Amino acid sequence: MSVLGVGCDVVHLPRMHRLLTKYDAGSRGFQRVVSKFMHPTERIALGVDGASLSAGQIRYIAGTWALKEAALKALHCAAPLHTVLPPAMFIYTKLLYRQRRSNGVPQLLLDNEALRLDQLQFLRQAKFLSTLSHDNEYLVAYTTLIDTKNLV
């Protein structure tokens, strides 16, 4: 196993709360905001069923944003020289999606459909290790992109 890249991101939760509560959770404005960085799988997992968001839903959205920002930084470390990565919006909404493991730990997965792009072939044998932590006001995400070729 070798480390290909590392990334970190910090989100100020009150700022994310202000951004997300500008719109009713079921509105087109809200959908427009989250569709810029959330994979369809994540939007389904979010489970918006009313006009307002719970504190847990806001943390979920903030955590998703932070994980993807951290992952983008790791990807830029890992991309082979002269490789032009797809735009960030493609990476956020098509390539990466967040799921929880059975123990509740978040994981970032690579969408196999998006991995068909030539410039993403270097990720075919890679995976992200991820962690989130938060307190009342801040949420931090760390990601490590590893090569799984030689994993036992």
Swiss-Prot record:
Belongs to the P-Pant transferase superfamily. AcpS family. Its main location: mitochondrion. It comes from Candida glabrata (strain ATCC 2001 / BCRC 20586 / JCM 3761 / NBRC 0622 / NRRL Y-65 / CBS 138) (Yeast). Keywords: Fatty acid biosynthesis, Fatty acid metabolism, Lipid biosynthesis, Lipid metabolism, Mitochondrion, Transferase. It is found in: Mitochondrion. This is Mitochondrial holo-[acyl-carrier-protein] synthase. It catalyses: apo-[ACP] + CoA = holo-[ACP] + adenosine 3',5'-bisphosphate + H(+). One of its GO terms (biological process) is holo-[acyl-carrier-protein] biosynthetic process. InterPro entries: 4-PPantetheinyl_Trfase_dom, 4-PPantetheinyl_Trfase_dom_sf, PPTase_2.
